[in-house]
């Protein structure tokens, strides 16, 4: 226990990773042609493929929030790709807004990097919402990604936390105790015991 944790030490201060989920819906995909132009073709192709994956993953991301599953990417490569913006000093109709796309991609990469990591400890107070209160796209997303926790949003977060932890990591959650005995949570219990 360290009551001065948030003050840090002389050279080390804690840096919480708190972000608002960003959507990729309004990122102009045609601008990708202006990024990574000085990179070797194989690296550029790999980076573009990973950026397109992130853009697809973050479509309507505000609907799903932190239950999105983000694969680990080559973050250093993506940083180089996004920071290599070349519009030849000319603003054309095609390149108009590429600086804004640059900023959005940087933010998206930052959030994706945090969401893809594994952590030693995860502490949450998940939202509570039964399936009857969810919109159809959320229900479909949960069935595809968290089927054993589809009874309630808090059980989805329980599964998400389990995926976010390193081996032998610690989790702390404020959840309803009903998951321990209701039959609708039996598959969740089975997965949590694995």
Regions found by a protein language model. Name each.
Residues 1-193:
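SAM-dependent methyltransferase catalytic region
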């Amino acid at each position: 226990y360290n009551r001065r944790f948030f003050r840090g030490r002389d050279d080390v201060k804690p840096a919480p990773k708190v972000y608002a989920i960003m959507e990729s819906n309004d990122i102009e995909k045609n601008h990708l042609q202006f990024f990574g132009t000085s990179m070797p073709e194989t690296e550029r192709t790999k980076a573009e493929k990973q950026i397109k994956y992130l853009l697809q993953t973050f479509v309507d991301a505000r609907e799903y929030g932190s239950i999105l599953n983000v694969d680990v990417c080559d973050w250093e490569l993506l940083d180089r790709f996004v920071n290599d913006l070349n519009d030849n000093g000319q603003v054309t109709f095609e390149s108009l807004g590429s600086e804004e796309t640059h900023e959005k991609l940087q933010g998206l990469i930052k959030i994706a990097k945090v969401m893809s990591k594994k952590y030693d400890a995860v502490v949450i107070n998940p939202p509570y919402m039964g399936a009857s209160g969810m919109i159809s796209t959320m229900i479909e997303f949960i069935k595809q990604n968290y089927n054993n926790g589809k009874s309630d949003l808090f059980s989805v977060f329980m599964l998400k936390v389990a995926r976010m932890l390193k081996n032998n990591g610690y989790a702390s959650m404020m959840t309803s105790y009903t998951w321990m005995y209701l039959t609708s949570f039996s598959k969740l219990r089975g997965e949590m015991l694995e």
